[in-house]
Amino acid sequence: MALLPVGIRFIISFSRDQWYRAFIFMLTFLLYASFHLSRKPISIVKGELHKQCTAGDGPESPFSDPSSSTRHGPTHWLLNNETDCGWAPFDKNNYQQLLGALDYAFLCAYAIGMYLSGIIGERLPIRYYLTFGMLASGAFTALFGLGYFYNIHSLGFYVVTQIINGLVQTTGWPSVVTCLSNWFGKGRRGLIMGIWNSHTSVGNILGSLIAGYWVSTCWGLSFIVPGAIVAAMGIVCFLFLIEHPKDVKCSSTLPTHPRASENGINRFRLQKQTTYSEKNGPLDPELQCLLLSDGKNPLHPSHIVVLPADGNMAAISFTGALRIPGVIEFSLCLLFAKLVSYTFLFWLPLYITSVDHLDAKKAGELSTLFDVGGIFGGILAGVISDRLEKRASTCGLMLLLAAPTLYVFSSVSRMGLEATIAMLLLSGALVSGPYALITTAVSADLGTHKSLKGNSHALSTVTAIIDGTGSVGAALGPLLAGLISPSGWSNVFYMLMFADACALLFLVRLIHKELSCPGPAAGIQAPLKEH
């Protein structure tokens, strides 16, 4: 018998289940990368919506008033319907506040919508829900770009478009995280989701390059092309997304070690012993360790989420999800971590334009290095948290290093492109690492927490609560940057450093619990002890 071709031998070396999981991994990666691809153009186009006046109109500093040169009549209008100093109404002296309003409109709507999205998503098929969101997102992203071709200069048009786009984009994150968690168990979740979460940076990079290609010649296409890509991926989602392994008769991935307990904050290998609560019977020992309030007494039994035992897993309530240990702390931590990340997402190209005096296209391309650093930061955070089996401690370490790094960034970025490039990579890794870990592995761990008694229906709500709270910070960050930047970019960096410190503060209790509770790092199966 002739030997099978190498390619065929490679294909059959993997099981049917493994091929399906690889397919879902890549599909959800591309689906959410397209969401981020559509969010990036606004930050690239800012430099074109408001730009320095031509030499004939006189010099302009980054914070000077260019509006006087754009109100003298049609002689100052170019063939592409924009003025020498930008696109009305963003050519005025308060352009930073107006551009900040666009960010705030999108992110505030996103934050509010996210709380509702998880609840709605648990009650609808993921494939239909996500398809609708992607088609609508593509339409409203493209609608923003149509303002260029139809010569629209109404601030209200752009703000309303951003609000609706922010609402429909909330369908994405809870859906893809829930789908991926259905297919992948808890083993090496930090590494798997750390790699998978690089879709954020990949989407940002592609969005920057696509938007940058047209920004100086026809900025409307910087929105229309990404919008078309998101809509096309929505059709792909409808045709190919498989919500759960059981839908194609695949097995669900189970934890490798049946005696090892995992909770998303830490993973413990404990001697098999049982504790009891008054009403609920056996309580998982790792859950008891997590619930210890002062090292001696467990918290009130109400902190345990009780679900029906008849096998009919109803969707968890909002308050029930909040009672899962660690949800509130990680949500508040993400609020400040995402504030920092989204400030860079929306304002970094404009900062580079101001400091390094580059045009919008080159600044957009250079800003992608922050996302390149974010890819490595997310993977590194996942690997470290899997190795140490301490999610909160990993986030805390990176947040601790991020604050002084931002200070150095603000100091050396004015020294030339080489210094800016180095600090973009380092800052991207440290800023994006905790953000990536919390929104993926931590959210998935908490959404499948032992206290839920196996109810996977909680995952979408938990993910939405954590990311929704983080999105409040994402809305505040760009808004504050727009208000603070006229007083100097250094003050913006001080604000970001303060936010990192606040994010770390909310993890102190969980870090203390991780370091005080026994774990497998000790190399033995230790009994649960009172501390």
UniProtKB/Swiss-Prot annotation:
Pfam families: MFS_1
Keywords tagged on the record: Antiport, Endoplasmic reticulum, Membrane, Sugar transport, Transmembrane, Transmembrane helix, Transport
PROSITE patterns to which the protein is assigned, alphabetical: MFS
Main location: endoplasmic reticulum
Membrane-spanning intervals of the chain: 18-38, 100-120, 129-149, 157-177, 192-214, 222-242, 332-352, 364-384, 392-412, 419-439, 464-484, 488-508
GO molecular function: glucose 6-phosphate:phosphate antiporter activity
Its membrane topology: Multi-pass membrane protein
Location within or outside the cell: Endoplasmic reticulum membrane
Region (Disordered), start-end ranges: 53-72
InterPro entries: MFS, MFS_dom, MFS_trans_sf, SLC37A1_2, Sugar_P_transporter
GO biological process, one term: glucose-6-phosphate transport
Family as reported in the entry's similarity comment: Belongs to the major facilitator superfamily. Organophosphate:Pi antiporter (OPA) (TC 2.A.1.4) family.
PANTHER family per UniProt: GLUCOSE-6-PHOSPHATE EXCHANGER SLC37A1, MAJOR FACILITATOR SUPERFAMILY TRANSPORTER 16, ISOFORM B
Chain's role: Inorganic phosphate and glucose-6-phosphate antiporter. May transport cytoplasmic glucose-6-phosphate into the lumen of the endoplasmic reticulum and translocate inorganic phosphate into the opposite direction. Independent of a lumenal glucose-6-phosphatase. May not play a role in homeostatic regulation of blood glucose levels.
Protein name in UniProt: Glucose-6-phosphate exchanger SLC37A1
Organism: Mus musculus (Mouse)
